[in-house]
Regions:
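N-terminal membrane-targeting hydrophobic helices
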Residues: 1-247
C-alpha cells in the first residue's frame, strides 16, 4: 500500500476473530505500520530489510519498541489530541509483554505479506508474472501502471475506507458530548496531516527530479513516507501544548 496508515485495516478483523481476541491491538497496529516507518526517517536500506521476516527483527522491532515507549511516556498527553482511546500497552506482566511482542510480529507479518503482492520488489510480484502485467502503456520514464500498482492504490482506498467505517461505528456508540469532542480533535488531526504534507512537498519534489522531469511514482513515495515524520512531530507538539496550556 502506498499509504502506511491503511495497513492497520488488516489487523482489526484479526483482532475481532475467534483466534485473535487475546492479541494486543495497539501492538498489532504498531507492528502493522513498522516496516514503513523507517522510510519516514530516511533509513531506506533498513526499511527494505524490515520488509523481510528475518530483517524485521533487527530493524522494525526496535522501531516498534521505541514507538511503544513514546506512547508509554505520552499516553496522557496524546489523549488530548487523538479522537480515539489511547491506552498504554506496556505492563509489568511478563505474559502480557510476551503477547505484545507476538502481536508486534503478527502485525508486521500482515504488512510484509501484503506488500509481497503489491510492490515491484515483492516476492509474489517477482514470482507471479500476472502481477507484472502493464495496464497503462506510454507513460514516460518507465512510469507504467502494472497490476501490482493497481493493487497498491486499491488496497489503500479500501483500507482507509474500512478504518473510517470502524471509527464511525465507534463514534455512534458515544454520548453526544464525546462525539463533538472527537470531531474537533479529528479536524485538528486532519489539519496537522495537511500541514505535514505541505511541509514535505518541496522536499519530495526535489528528490523526485530526474533528467526528464518529475518521476510521479517517486514523488508519491517520498511525499507519503516523509510526511509521516512531520505529522508525528506535529501531533506530539500539539499534545504537549495542550497539556502545558491546561496547567
Amino acid at each position: 500500500m502506498p499509504w502506511t496508515f491503511a495497513h492497520p485495516a488488516i489487523v482489526f478483523p484479526l483482532k475481532q476473530s475467534r483466534y485473535g481476541r487475546w492479541l494486543n491491538l495497539p501492538a498489532l497496529i504498531t507492528g502493522g505500520v513498522s516496516p514503513d516507518l523507517l522510510y519516514s526517517s530516511g533509513m531506506y536500506r533498513a526499511a527494505d530489510e524490515a520488509h523481510h521476516f528475518t530483517g524485521w527483527f533487527y530493524t522494525g522491532l526496535p522501531v516498534c519498541l521505541a514507538v511503544l515507549l513514546i506512547f508509554h511516556w505520552l499516553s496522557v498527553s496524546l489523549k488530548t489530541v487523538l479522537p480515539f482511546p489511547v491506552t498504554d500497552p506496556l505492563t509489568c506482566s511478563l505474559r502480557k509483554n510476551s503477547v505484545i511482542l507476538l502481536s508486534l510480529f503478527i502485525g508486521a507479518a500482515t504488512h510484509i505479506i501484503w506488500d509481497a503482492f503489491t510492490h515491484e520488489t515483492g516476492t509474489m510480484v517477482r514470482a507471479l508474472s500476472v502481477l507484472q502485467v502493464s495496464l497503462l502503456q506510454g507513460m514516460t520514464d518507465g512510469q507504467e501502471i502494472a497490476v501490482y500498482k493497481v493493487l497498491q492504490h486499491l488496497g489503500s482506498l479500501l483500507g482507509t475506507g474500512y478504518l473510517c467505517l470502524k471509527f464511525a461505528q465507534y463514534q455512534r456508540a458515544l454520548p453526544e458530548a464525546e462525539k463533538r469532542g472527537n470531531l474537533i480533535r479529528l479536524i485538528r488531526l486532519i489539519a496537522l496531516a495537511v500541514l505535514g504534507a505541505l511541509c514535505t512537498a518541496p522536499l519530495a519534489y526535489g528528490l523526485a527530479q530526474t533528467e526528464t522531469g518529475v518521476h510521479i511514482n517517486r514523488f508519491v513515495f517520498y511525499e507519503l513516507s516523509l510526511s509521516i515524520s512531520f505529522f508525528a512531530g506535529f501531533v506530539v507538539l500539539a499534545a504537549l501544548f495542550q497539556v502545558i496550556r491546561k496547567r
